[in-house]
Curated annotation (Swiss-Prot):
Protein name, as recorded: Sulfur carrier protein FdhD
Family that this chain belongs to: Belongs to the FdhD family.
Lineage, highest ranks first: Bacteria, Bacillati, Bacillota, Bacilli, Bacillales
Gene Ontology CC annotations of this record: cytoplasm
InterPro entries: Cytidine_deaminase-like (IPR016193), FdhD (IPR003786)
Highest taxon in the source lineage: Bacteria
SUPFAM superfamilies assigned: Cytidine deaminase-like
PANTHER family assigned: FORMATE DEHYDROGENASE (PTHR30592), SULFUR CARRIER PROTEIN FDHD (PTHR30592:SF1)
Coiled-coil region: none
Active-site residues, Swiss-Prot/TrEMBL: C107 (cysteine persulfide intermediate)
Assigned keywords, A-Z: Cytoplasm, Molybdenum cofactor biosynthesis
Protein location: Cytoplasm
Length: 263
């Protein structure tokens, strides 16, 4: 159990017709305001663990950085809930970058990205890895077994970067998008290649989740939950295999089925 993920709190638990006084683990909720080059960039409500990775991954997802070398300096003030980031020369553009702009589809098969920065940074996956069906099941089981923070609180999302053979790193957060940003930040900080990896995820596969996977360059996304229609439309166009409802010995493959191998 991460000391930063939860806090013990007295509760009254109703059981067998009466209340019992107990202590329970409650997931921490923490606002983190990110400033970039002296300007407020965003405030993220998150779990206060691995905040450096969260900031790096979030900035990369937003298109503000490509690698950690784009960051000249970063200070995390965990007590006050601030992250101060200074980008290297030629980094973040001026004010227009802070306001997201809607980009709709134009003509032909143009992608229906939500925002301009998504259009710039999402990658179409060509090739990608293959995964055996049995390995999909084994990896989801491993995520569940190693998700100690969720087991204690019931209030956290978990995301793992893995090869078809083993877990590489697991991150947890109250926000499913934050858990993915922490993975992204970990990979950038430690220079971990992502193209030969997959994501194992506990949450719903929304369009935002799918776009984060695309920006990381990951070709396979496994989830125990359901996808949304827009997520699957994007997965089709971006070349990402989405596996959902991965529970027990069964799962659904929604897009690019050829990457999942039977036998």
């Amino acid at each position: 159990m991460s000391g930063f993920a939860a806090k013990r709190r007295p509760i009254a638990k109703y059981r067998n017709g009466r209340f019992v006084e107990e202590e329970d683990e409650i997931a921490l909720e923490f606002p983190l305001t990110i400033t970039v080059n002296g300007e407020e960039f965003a405030t993220i409500v998150c779990t206060p663990a691995h905040l450096d990775e969260l900031v790096i991954g979030f900035l990369a997802s937003e298109g503000a950085i490509r690698t950690c070398s784009d960051i000249k300096g970063m200070t995390i003030d965990g007590e006050r809930g601030f992250a101060y980031v200074e980008l290297a020369a030629g980094g973040l553009p001026a004010k227009q970058f802070y306001a997201k702009r809607f980009i709709g589809s134009c003509c032909g098969k143009s992608r229906q990205f939500y925002f301009y920065n998504d259009m710039k940074t999402a990658k179409t996956i060509v090739g990608g890895i293959t995964v055996k069906a049995d390995d999909c099941i084994r990896l989801m089981k491993a995520l569940h077994e190693r998700s100690t923070d969720f087991a204690a609180t019931g209030g956290l999302h978990n995301a793992a970067l893995a090869t078809p053979d083993e877990m590489v790193v697991i991150r947890s957060d109250i926000g499913r998008h934050n858990a993915l940003d922490k993975l992204y930040g970990y990979c950038l900080r430690h220079q971990v290649a992502m193209k030969d990896k997959l994501i194992v995820f506990s949450g719903r596969v929304s369009s935002e989740v799918l776009l984060k996977a695309a920006k990381m360059g990951v070709s396979v996304l496994l989830s125990k939950s359901a996808p949304t229609t827009l997520a699957l439309d994007l997965a089709d166009e971006l070349g990402i295999t989405v596996v959902g409802f991965l529970r027990g010995q069964a799962f659904n493959v929604y897009t690019h089925e050829s990457r999942i191998i039977i036998g």
